[in-house]
């Protein structure tokens, strides 16, 4: 079967379903793909196909994630859905499946539950910027006031975690009834079935409310340095993969991290032994730098657009600690623990100053399998920004994954 071609001119957005177990995330994912397929926008995916999510590895952690894609009139979407709660936690913290926005699924029959709260908190901490809410299982509610009550509760919860609770669009419906309508008539068009229309209304809200993200190429230039060598008569070359932005010969860049920030000019760019005028996000490239000695550069520094990123040593982070079965520690650890923090291309030693539970109370120790907020101090300053991912390692093996939620100094 030929792969379906998507329109490359439409803007692309990464999205995901989040929410409490059994509130209908996977059923909704199936309903969205099926409803849009009936409009000729993508391939319908069954619940079982999505639920049997393949395992993948991100930063040494195994995560089960299902990826589906579909399009609306306006945009092309890559959509991620996870079978288990632990998979969501791992996914959001490692950034394995980056989300530009989320659909929060809440069962109208049950209202917000513990994982609803936890996913909203996580979305805030890891920098999922926007979400739209789908109140599912509307058919199980006889009283319109009850639906309104659930909506108010969810809006309050969103506001509590600093999302604009009063502005976020809410759509109610039944993913299951929409799927049933579509399975008996796969060619249903807009306006022909109440439940299918509600799924399409949800996607209209996603189209309207979740902004198209800035493309990596349009962001300010950053490249983590992987290696450095000197070429006799030409100077020093730093190699790595451009994380974002673009760079041209003649532009000024800054070397940031581990030592004092230093400004230098790009005198040449090379890729696969060929010289280039410009390098872009995603390129593996060698950058020739003016007036810099090989000894000035170390793996773990970054080259960046001047003023766009600064070195820091202390930050707050949201961390998932691996279980023994995942190859993590067998025993708990306490504050004062000094592992290595693997950031971009290098390990930096740091100490964990404090642990904080979701309710803001201090935690004494952390067990394998926990998710916790921790304050970290590094022994060397490195280029850090909010939303940056890192791994925690001990003796070369990964024991945790984290994301920077706030820079302290």
From Swiss-Prot:
Region span, G2: 60-64
Amino acids binding Mg(2+): 26
Top class in the EC scheme: hydrolase
Chain segments carrying region G3: 81-84
Protein name (record): Elongation factor Tu, cyanelle
Chain segments carrying region G5: 174-176
Ranges where the record places region G4: 136-139
Record family assignment: Belongs to the TRAFAC class translation factor GTPase superfamily. Classic translation factor GTPase family. EF-Tu/EF-1A subfamily.
GO CC annotation terms, alphabetical: cyanelle; cytosol
């Amino acid at each position: 079967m030929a792969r379906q071609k998507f329109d490359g001119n439409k803007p692309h957005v990464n999205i995901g379903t989040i929410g409490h177990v059994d509130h209908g995330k996977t059923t909704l994912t199936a309903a969205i793909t099926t409803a849009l397929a009936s409009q000729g926008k993508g391939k319908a995916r069954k619940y079982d196909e999505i639920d049997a999510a393949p395992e993948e590895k991100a930063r040494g952690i195994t995560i089960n994630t299902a990826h589906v894609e579909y399009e609306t009139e306006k945009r092309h979407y890559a959509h991620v859905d996870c079978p288990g709660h632990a998979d969501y936690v791992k996914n959001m913290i490692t950034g394995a499946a980056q989300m530009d926005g989320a659909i929060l699924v809440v069962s109208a029959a049950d209202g917000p539950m513990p994982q609803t709260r936890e996913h909203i908190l996580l979305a805030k901490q890891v920098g999922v910027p926007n979400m739209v809410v789908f109140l599912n299982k509307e058919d199980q509610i006889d009283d319109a006031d009850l639906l309104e009550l659930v909506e108010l509760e969810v809006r309050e919860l969103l506001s509590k975690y600093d999302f604009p609770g009063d502005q976020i669009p809410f759509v109610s419906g039944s993913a299951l009834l929409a799927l049933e309508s579509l399975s008996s008539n796969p060619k249903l068009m807009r306006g022909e079935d109440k439940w299918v229309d509600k799924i399409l209304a949800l996607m209209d809200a996603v189209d309207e409310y979740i902004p198209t993200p800035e493309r990596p190429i349009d962001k300010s230039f950053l490249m983590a340095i992987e290696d450095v060598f000197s070429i006799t008569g030409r100077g020093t070359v730093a190699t790595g993969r451009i994380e974002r932005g673009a760079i041209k010969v003649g532009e000024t860049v800054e070397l940031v991290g581990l030592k004092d920030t230093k400004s230098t000019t790009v005198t040449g760019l090379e890729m696969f032994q060929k010289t280039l005028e410009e390098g872009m996000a995603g390129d593996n490239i060698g950058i020739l730098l003016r007036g810099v000695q090989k000894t000035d550069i170390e793996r773990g520094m970054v080259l960046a657009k001047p003023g766009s990123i600064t070195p820091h040593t202390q930050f707050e982070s949201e961390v998932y600690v691996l279980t023994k079965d995942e190859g993590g520690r067998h025993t708990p650890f306490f504050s004062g623990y000094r592992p290595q923090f693997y950031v971009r291309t290098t390990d930096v030693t740091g100490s964990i100053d404090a642990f904080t539970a979701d309710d803001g109370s201090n935690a004494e120790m952390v067990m394998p399998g926990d998710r916790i907020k921790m304050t970290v101090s590094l022994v060397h300053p490195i280029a850090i920004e909010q939303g940056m991912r890192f791994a925690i390692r001990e003796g070369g093996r990964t024991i945790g994954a984290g994301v920077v939620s706030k820079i302290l100094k």
